[in-house]
Amino acid sequence: MKKEFGKVGVLFGGRSAEREVSLMSGKGVLAALLSKGIDAHPFDPAERSLAELAAEKFDRVFIALHGRFGEDGSLQGALEQLGIPYTGPGVMASAIAMDKVITKRVCLSHGVPTPKFTALEVEATTAEQLQAIAAEFGMPLMLKAPHEGSTIGIAKVETAEGMQAGFDLCAKYDDVVLVEQFVKGRELTVPVLGSGRNARALPIVEIIAPQGNYDYEHKYFSDDTQYLCPAPFDAAFTKRVQALAVSAFNAVGCTGWARVDFLVRESDNEPFLLEINTSPGMTGHSLVPMSAKVAGTAYEDLCVEILRMAKLGLKPVQHK
């Protein structure tokens, strides 16, 4: 496989709030690629300049970075400038999916349902506005920092009196706070591989966390969280959710791979989009490898498949 892929950089670590998770993902991917005979090397953008990728003649990179500066389009843009093919979605799709508010707006326009929401600018929002939203939406509410992942910068607010504290917590991470109607129900995720008409959904994973608290600790370090894969739904519902996942994936322009998260409302079994993750975790607790395994693809083979789809999203201008 050395000839097929050349010199491969595995990008992990980085400068986001999700650095710890990225280190775990990257080490797993690196070991998997090495086990397949691929000339793979670790590369931490927090410690080295991206220009070194070109100087050291890397042929392609596997992005195992999470959060800002890794899956928000900025890294993808730099790699486009360097002319180095990379895994996962391109500049535009990465930037859209990193913003939960824009993702919701785009997916709604393509018929993918999402919980009722609004976006508030931190500097312009008053206490009175928070109370008005609480009255309009009803309680409880989910408040989120739109550009963070791994459950960072999220607050569940049970009462109107708790709005300010929840808002302030999210404001530590972002200039905008997403306010979302709370949906009581089951949490699902659907990995998607491929591009366009060839995009395909993998088996659905249902996440059952203790007391429904799927936070950072339970997501990456706890053995108490249960995962059901394939999720126990009938064939018709499974097909519907997988189709919604592919629709959301294509709506924002994803290519390569991504993970689409949903909530299924308890009262009527209706699915709602939560977010799209364009650089999903690849740790021992991660959901994409879990789903792929059920579909018959081992972790090492999944890493190779993702790497094989690495590409540049922008065609260079041909000057005459």
Curated annotation (Swiss-Prot):
Signal peptide: none
Keywords (A to Z) from UniProt: ATP-binding, Cell shape, Cell wall biogenesis/degradation, Cytoplasm, Ligase, Magnesium, Manganese, Metal-binding, Nucleotide-binding, Peptidoglycan synthesis
Domain ATP-grasp as annotated: residue spans: 104-308
EC number: 6.3.2.4
Catalyses which reaction(s): 2 D-alanine + ATP = D-alanyl-D-alanine + ADP + phosphate + H(+)
Cofactor descriptive note: Binds 2 magnesium or manganese ions per subunit.
Subcellular location: Cytoplasm
Pfam families membership: Dala_Dala_lig_C (PF07478), Dala_Dala_lig_N (PF01820)
Keyword field contains Transmembrane: no
Protein name: D-alanine--D-alanine ligase
